[in-house]
């Protein structure tokens, strides 16, 4: 493994009950413009709820400012309460619901929230780019949040990860060179290593704290960073793509945050143009693309941008993820001009033999040939809007 660092180490705030990572000092950090690009399994950029941990002797509150009614982010900090009564402050979050629960709020899904019971807080800190927290939940194992938004759950996030990898890579023959924008925890890399044809994987993660959390709490994932085919780059994902050699990659996977605030650029035409340039003829890209239940206006704009850039094919797929808003998430799958790519009919499906014998990984939990094909079948309301 080669590790290339293009950003500075983040400083981290630790309060009572948090578990500090080695090498970080107490202090504050400032958000930089690079936050929008190359984050790990991201859905951040929200006004997020945060819980209070366990029996919480001191209930933390958050006072909503008047701007909250207009979707602005003027909110007070939320807290987590611990059994010993100490409070752990999570900066930039909105109010919690009750002791022992993590709750996520966002202007992207107004009028609703998602909550998980917290068994144990494992880590909380602030990097140069975001608040990072990891806790053990009662239902889904370890839960990673960034800026108070759930990014991945150990026992419930596999549909998202398997689909964002196998929908594109299962649609092209023998992928060899792949780029992951984000992926600092390692779930996406874990799935990608199922393909014996792969010779090189570049991972661009902007936040070194996310990588450190992986090494400490997900060692079975972080071990894959040591694979000789893997280069881990700590830096800006959009800048990396822009500077990439033309026609170099067979596939690019974009694990981005939601297309609001600083992450908006990752869903607009200039970024997609850079991605298309970095792909070979007939190369493919897959990026997360929100929920059909809440974000059709966003999805239509993403599709319009992709249709202007990608001259091969442009497709929308979706799947179920229990810990994401509305329980579903979508994907944009596009190909550059060149050899035809039919995303709806995979030609390189991962089968049982490839998964368990050649790659020596555990069987897939969600993805299969039928799920791949079904992901492109949309409800009537979504199909009419997307195809219009």
From Swiss-Prot:
Q: What upregulates or represses it?
A: Triggered by jasmonic acid (MeJA); this induction is repressed by 2-chloroethylphosphonic acid (ethephon), an ethylene precursor, that can by alleviated by 1-methylcyclopropene (1-MCP), a competitive inhibitor of ethylene receptors. Accumulates upon wounding and feeding by the specialist herbivore Manduca sexta; these induction is dramatically amplified by a pretreatment with 1-MCP.
Q: In which tissues is it expressed?
A: Mainly expressed in roots.
Q: Fetch the InterPro entries from UniProt.
A: PABS, PABS_CS, Putrescine_N-MeTfrase, SAM-dependent_MTases_sf, Spermi_synthase, Spermidine_synt_N, Spermidine_synt_N_sf
The record's keywords, sorted A to Z, are: Alkaloid metabolism, Methyltransferase, Polyamine biosynthesis, S-adenosyl-L-methionine, Transferase
> What broad class of enzyme is this?
transferase
CDD domains linked to this entry: AdoMet_MTases
Xref: Pfam families? Spermine_synt_N, Spermine_synth
Q: Could you tell me the Gene Ontology terms of the biological process aspect for this record?
A: alkaloid metabolic process; methylation; nicotine biosynthetic process; response to insect; response to jasmonic acid; response to wounding; spermidine biosynthetic process
Q: What pathway is this protein said to act in by its record?
A: Alkaloid biosynthesis; nicotine biosynthesis
Where does the source fall among the domains of life? Eukaryota
Catalyzed chemical reaction(s) = putrescine + S-adenosyl-L-methionine = N-methylputrescine + S-adenosyl-L-homocysteine + H(+)
Per the record, GO CC terms?
cytosol
Biased segments, Polar residues type: 1-14, 23-39, 46-88
- Kindly indicate whether the keyword Methyltransferase belongs to this entry: yes
User: Where does the record place the region Disordered?
Assistant: 1-88
**A GO molecular-function descriptor:** spermidine synthase activity
Record carries keyword Methyltransferase: yes
Identify which residues the record assigns to the active site: 255
Positions that bind S-adenosyl-L-methionine: 130, 205, 236-237, 324
Residue ranges occupied by any PABS domain in the UniProt entry: 99-336
Q: What is its EC number?
A: 2.1.1.53
According to its UniProt entry, what is the function of this protein?
A: Involved in the biosynthesis of pyridine alkaloid natural products, leading mainly to the production of anabasine, anatabine, nicotine and nornicotine, effective deterrents against herbivores with antiparasitic and pesticide properties (neurotoxins); nornicotine serves as the precursor in the synthesis of the carcinogen compound N'-nitrosonornicotine (NNN). Methyltransferase that mediates the conversion of putrescine to N-methylputrescine.
The similarity comment for this entry is: Belongs to the class I-like SAM-binding methyltransferase superfamily. Spermidine/spermine synthase family.
- Entry's HAMAP family? Spermidine_synth
Q: What protein am I looking at?
A: Putrescine N-methyltransferase 1
Name its species.
Nicotiana attenuata
What lineage is this protein's organism placed in? Eukaryota, Viridiplantae, Streptophyta, Embryophyta, Tracheophyta
Record gene name: PMT1
